């Protein structure tokens, strides 16, 4: 089987997978079920860390958690903070491994842009995901950051509409 990146002609298939919209998640038990998906965008993930992070997010009014579903199965999740009107910061974006490289991550970003009339999106990522942001026309700036006394390369990703 050959896997290719999604193209604009695939948008109908992608919208079928995601039911044409993102669903905001507010129930922590429902969110907790998605650990296996979301852990791919966490640093040294554990279920306990995930649950604590979600609890923190749910207590912050500016942070929203959205998912993309097919039937009752979550295919992707995105966590964003609304900085101010028309501006968000992406805290995490993840797609189920069975559905990666089908355009679902791009669909989630584009759906948020349309739904909230976004003019600016900020994200920070590592080398594993910078290609996703580059493919979605984000401007990329590389910088160094210290994690656990270790210098790591990070990327600031910005999309200005």
Task: Please tell me what each predicted stretch does.
Residues 31-32, 36-70, 77:
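Active-site rim helix/loop that mediates acceptor-substrate recognition in acyltransferases
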Residues 2-34:
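A short beta-loop-alpha structural element at the N-terminal edge
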Residues 114-127:
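Conserved GNAT acetyl-CoA-binding A-motif
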Residues 47-50, 91-100, 131-135:
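Acidic/histidine-enriched, beta-strand-rich ligand/metal-binding domains
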């Amino acid at each position: 089987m050959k896997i290719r990146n999604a193209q604009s002609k695939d948008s109908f298939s992608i919208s079928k997978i995601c039911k044409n919209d993102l669903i905001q998640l507010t129930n922590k038990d429902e969110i907790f079920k998605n650990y296996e998906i979301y852990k791919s965008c966490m640093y040294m993930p554990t279920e306990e860390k995930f649950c604590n992070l979600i609890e923190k997010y749910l207590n912050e009014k500016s942070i929203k958690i959205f998912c993309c579903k097919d039937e009752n199965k979550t295919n992707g999740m995105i966590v964003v903070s609304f900085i101010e009107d028309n501006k968000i910061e992406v805290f995490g974006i993840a797609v189920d491994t069975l559905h990666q490289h089908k355009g679902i991550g791009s669909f989630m970003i584009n759906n948020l842009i349309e739904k909230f009339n976004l003019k600016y999106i900020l994200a920070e990522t590592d080398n594993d995901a910078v290609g996703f942001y580059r493919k979605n026309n984000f401007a990329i700036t590389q910088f160094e950051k210290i994690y656990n006394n270790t210098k790591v390369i990070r990327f600031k990703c910005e999309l200005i509409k």
